[in-house]
Design a protein with these regions (language model features):
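Short acidic/polar hinge/loop motifs at secondary-structure boundaries
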Residues: 121-149, 168, 266-268, 273
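Conserved C-terminal beta-signal and adjacent last beta-strands/turns
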Residues: 6, 249-251, 499, 513, ...
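Surface-exposed extracellular loop regions of Gram-negative outer-membrane beta-barrel proteins
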Residues: 260-265, 470-475, 486, 500-552, ...
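Gram-negative outer-membrane beta-barrel transporters
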Residues: 393, 456-461, 471, 568-572, ...
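Extracytoplasmic beta-strand/coil segments of soluble accessory domains associated
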Residues: 80-121, 143
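Transmembrane beta-barrel wall of Gram-negative outer-membrane proteins
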Residues: 177, 184-215, 220-258, 293, ...
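A beta-strand signature from Gram-negative outer-membrane beta-barrel systems
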Residues: 136-181
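N-terminal periplasmic "start-of-domain" segments of outer-membrane beta-barrel proteins
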Residues: 27-30, 40-74, 102
Length: 793
């Protein structure tokens, strides 16, 4: 039977998975989809719009974060933190600044995790980076999130080594509805959200509009944020088969960053919220890490849903620009941040006096230090066309193509001379408003095509597919107009999976049992930043593809009110290449170092389980035990960027070293309770009243500090500093009540780090691989927030 797209609108305003209690991150194999048909929607139906895979039948390891769970965590300062509590996922703030966050899955960093928005890749093609601060509006605009660990469900995401995260934004509901909410933290960080859905309009139109405004400070010193976020979703239904979906999302923002790691001694002296990135300039707080950015993002999707043939076509464009304050020092000068007063903050008065005192023959002040605005931006555009044809009742053929265009630019502009008349930088004078250093960018053309077959019966779900990738990369000098030659590469991936239902749930039997396995191989193209790493127009020597091999197997069981999944995985990462500039100056040849031959092996076991203890109480638990280690001693080469001549060669000793930046042991649990109560405000309006509570516990252990492989040039170099394990407890309470006909009120309060644990969140290894030389960021102390929502139907 053909689906009407307005059913999708209804689905997108209904919980994905609900089995009592507050919203959950359901473990794979949950049977709760069949528990309450009137309040659920299958993931298969949602995937019509955004490639959500069905937890019930897929041979992949999936976790879906539902709208209820997102509502509980909307006060989190960083979007990725809503993904905590999933085994193998380490999602935290990077430095404590609002919006600055990092995501690791199964030991792989952000550039090896695919991020998709409504089924469309949104990462940069230069390095695979994902700057979450550019997407601050996502926390309010998101309807649901699916985390696909391992190779992922998408055939077009070639960077999914650790996994894939697919984010679904809100669309119009079936009927007119609105929401107003406001929340604030103990530091005064306040967010206001307005959301309105038109419901189904005449002639097949529907729209949803959301606006949010966030301002205030976090627990870190001088961490102001000011951002206005928006989402607009418009759909048009053409009959029962065709639908157009337009989405616009953006978040112009300004926020102060803490981007200088701290030592243990500094944290003990000044506290974990200490930042040495600011001081008083002309009597006002001045941050040297202020960031400003705006990336408006637009998509247009065409959906055809037929009995035998269905397709999804998308076009998208993003035009990003912004910048961030940074420091610059003359050749003989020390750094700005080294000028500290008695409180540990930047002494701008001393810096200005030093700048003014240094005179040339004409009496002009020659600055030793200055502030610049590091400006950057890009144009990102692309198109995806995919379709599937049902050959028989059991066999389906899928195929598609994708094109991505990514063009970047960057330049540095003199922002503040700090009392001087000009800055003498490598022999050239620079005055206020001048551009300093190189101005360049990279252009990327990335294409891919895939074909996949699926075989589905009552017992079996099999799929196998292959994808071919092509990348073309060129660098351009925006000062001279010169361009480099094109660097070209090809890649290919093959992946498949199988799931077998040993026991299927029936109307008379709730129990279900299945086993699954998946595997894949990816000859992966390096990012453009590897091919074009230098500040000149040279192409990096001897670039070769990475070779990634992944495999996983597991078992799922489900019963009335509960479920469990256990899986084991292995990921072999071969021929990882790192290319980094040693110098980036406009007037001299840069040197680069390239490290090749790095191998690593990631393996682990994961468990998730949940159980409804009563009608009002639900518990879930998870655990992960992993081993991620290097398996090779790579080769480092330093060479001249222009001539390509080798300057020196050296060995890089990473064999048997633990991978850093994420815990290799995780475990935790969560209790969720919902208590129906009588109406407290008005008689006859309390039928939907309830009080809910959620308490979570997350433990992280066996975590090593991050480190650069280039620092391991001695065979005696050992593991990075092992961070202390830590336990975090969070709690949320809330009250839902009907305050008037069609008006629901929700009052909530959240406390994170309930017992005020003192812990290290992330950091960089030091020379001695110990706490004394370690530099990093300590996690936030106990923090609370309160809020109020009004929903109108």
């Amino acid at each position: 039977m053909k689906k009407n797209i307005f059913l999708l609108g209804r689905m997108m305003s209904t919980p994905l998975v609900y089995a009592g209690g507050v919203g959950e991150s359901e473990p794979s194999g949950s049977n709760s989809l069949s528990a309450k048909h009137d309040s659920t929607v299958t993931l298969q139906e949602v995937s019509v719009r955004a490639n959500f895979a069905n937890e019930q039948v897929t041979p992949l390891n999936l976790t879906t974060i539902t709208p209820q769970s997102l509502r509980i965590h909307t006060t989190a300062p960083n979007y990725v933190e809503v993904m905590q509590g999933v085994p193998g996922v380490y999602a935290t703030s990077t430095s404590g600044s609002y919006g600055d966050a990092s995501l690791n899955i199964r030991g792989f960093k952000q550039d090896n995790v695919a991020i998709m928005l409504n089924g469309i890749p949104i990462q940069g093609l230069t390095s695979g980076s994902m700057y979450w601060s550019n997407w601050m509006g996502l926390s309010d605009a998101t309807y649901a999130i699916q985390i696909q660990k391992g190779m992922g469900n998408s055939m077009l995401a070639d960077c999914a080594m650790g996994g894939l995260v697919n984010i679904i934004t809100k669309t119009a509901s079936h009927s007119p509805a609105g929401e107003v909410s406001v929340s604030t933290t103990q530091q005064g960080l306040t967010k206001t959200v307005l959301n309105y859905s038109t419901g189904r309009l005449a002639n097949g139109w529907a729209a949803n509009a959301l606006v949010s405004y966030t301002r205030g400070n976090g627990f870190v010193e001088c961490s102001n944020v000011n951002t206005l976020s928006y989402l607009l979703s418009v759909s048009k239904n053409f009959g029962t088969d065709h639908t157009l979906l337009f989405t616009a999302i953006g978040s112009p923002e300004t926020h102060d960053q803490r981007n200088t790691e701290l030592s243990y001694e500094e944290v003990m002296n000044y506290g974990r919220g200490y930042s040495k990135n600011w001081g008083y300039l002309n009597g006002e707080k001045y941050s040297i890490g202020r960031n400003h950015y705006f990336k408006p993002y637009f998509t247009l999707q065409h959906l055809k849903n037929g009995d035998r043939f269905s397709m999804k076509n998308s076009v998208y464009v993003a035009i990003a620009s912004g910048g961030g304050r940074s420091t610059v020092s003359a050749n003989s000068g020390s750094s700005i941040i080294s000028h500290q007063d008695a409180t540990g903050h930047i002494d701008f008065d001393a810096i200005m006096q030093e700048n003014i005192a240094n005179k040339d023959a004409d009496g002009n002040s020659i600055g030793q230090y200055a502030m610049i605005d590091y400006l950057s931006g890009h144009l990102q555009a692309g198109a995806i066309a995919s379709g599937e044809y049902k050959l028989t009742e059991t066999t389906t053929l899928l195929g598609g193509v994708q094109y991505q265009y990514f063009d970047t630019w960057q330049k540095m502009k003199m922002l503040d001379l700090l009392g001087a008349d000009y800055l003498l930088y490598y022999g050239a004078p620079y005055r206020l408003g001048d551009y300093i250093g190189s101005r360049y960018g990279r252009t990327t053309h990335h294409t891919s095509a895939f074909v996949q077959g699926k075989y589905v019966t009552d017992r079996w779900n099999l799929h196998l597919g292959t994808t071919v990738f092509n990348g073309n990369y060129r660098r351009h000098n925006d000062q001279t107009g010169a361009v480099s030659d094109w660097a070209t590469g090809w890649g290919v991936s093959v992946k498949g999976g199988a799931l077998y239902h040993i026991l299927r749930a029936t109307p008379n039997r709730s129990a279900a049992l299945s086993v699954f396995a998946n595997a894949g191989f990816n000859s992966r193209l390096p990012y453009a930043g590897v091919y074009l790493a230098s500040s000149d127009l040279s192409i990096t020597n001897n670039v070769t593809n990475e070779k990634n091999t992944l495999g996983e197997m597991g078992v799922r069981a489900a019963w009335n009110g509960g479920g469990v999944e256990v899986s084991a995985y292995i990921a072999s990462w071969r021929n990882k290449t790192l290319t980094v500039n040693i110098a980036k100056r406009a007037n001299e040849a840069a040197e680069k170092f390239q490290i090749t031959g790095l191998n690593a092996l990631h393996k682990g076991v994961e468990l998730t389980a949940h159980q409804n203890l009563t009608d009002w109480l639900r518990v879930k638990a998870y655990a992960m035990l992993a081993s991620w280690k290097g398996e090779s001693c790579g080769k480092g080469i330093t060479y001249d960027s222009y001539s390509g001549a080798t300057l020196k060669e050296y060995a890089v000793y990473c064999n048997n070293l633990h991978v850093g930046d994420a815990p290799q042991t995780q475990y935790g649990a969560e209790l969720n309770a919902t208590f129906p109560i009588k109406g407290l405000l008005k008689r006859g309006m309390g039928k939907t009243d309830n009080v809910y509570a959620s308490v979570s516990w997350n433990a992280n252990a066996d975590m090593y500090a991050d480190f650069e492989p280039s620092s391991r040039t001695k065979e005696t170099d050992g593991d990075a500093y092992k961070l202390p394990s830590y336990h975090l407890f969070d709690a949320t309470v809330g009250w839902n009540t009907m305050v008037a006909k069609g008006v629901m009120m929700n009052i909530f309060a959240t406390c994170t780090n309930l017992f005020d644990a003192f812990y290290i969140q992330r950091g960089i290894d030091g020379k001695s691989h110990d706490l004394a030389t370690f530099r990093g960021y300590w996690g936030a102390p106990r923090m609370w927030s309160i809020g109020l929502r009004l929903n109108f139907q």
